[in-house]
Amino acid sequence: MSLQAFETSPSVAPLQPLHLIEEISHRVANEYTEAIATLHLAAAGTGDARVRAALGGAAARLRAHAEAHRALLAPAAVGPVDLADYVGQVCASMTRASLADHGVRLLVDADEIWLESGRSWRVGLIVAELIRNAARHGLGGGPGAIRVSIAKTCGQVSCGVSDNGRLSGAAAPGRGRRLVEALAAELGGSVDWWFTPAGCLARLEIPMTLAPAR
């Protein structure tokens, strides 16, 4: 086969980074579905009750993680979506997937805010990453509380994620922080962290709409 067959056609525009993430996410979701189906088939094909129960439990756990993954896919809606509802679904799926099993209480207090679907998706990605960092680093993988608050003031959306852990600023996660800052920049906003003896607070501030590029 000619190497030329593998060249990208100049008429095909390259995918933007977040579009690429979306495409990969859909493929991962399909892989979850196939893995769950395989576990169900294996469970149905065994006569050992303990093995069947273990396979069923593994399938249920994988299904919960798949649900959390799907919650972070870009909203199907083209127009504005209710940010509170969208983030609430993300938080609920993360609780079912892992937080509840570690004794983490995830509390959500969000105003009804209608935001363009692409912006809502990015906020959801940021919130999910901040929750993961709070659970893993702030709470150290153990029990505790994480609070998500979303409010609108003077044309700005303010989103805070706080925990009651003991993470110091010096130990702040690096890779997750860079991801959050990059997404915040795409939204035309910023994110700041505060570390106190009572826990960590990360606050995202973004405009309701992104000003057109000059």
How should each PLM-predicted stretch be described?
Residues 19-33, 37, 41:
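Conserved phosphoacceptor histidine of two-component systems
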Residues 34-38, 48-104:
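Conserved DHp (HisKA) dimerization/phosphotransfer helix of two-component histidine kinases, i.e.
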Residues 143-155:
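Short beta-strand/loop element within the Bergerat-fold HATPase_c
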Residues 159-165:
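Conserved DxG motif in ATP/Mg2+-binding regions
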Residues 160, 199-210:
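Short C-terminal beta-strand
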Residues 169-198:
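ATP phosphate-binding glycine-rich loop and adjacent ATP-lid/helix-beta elements
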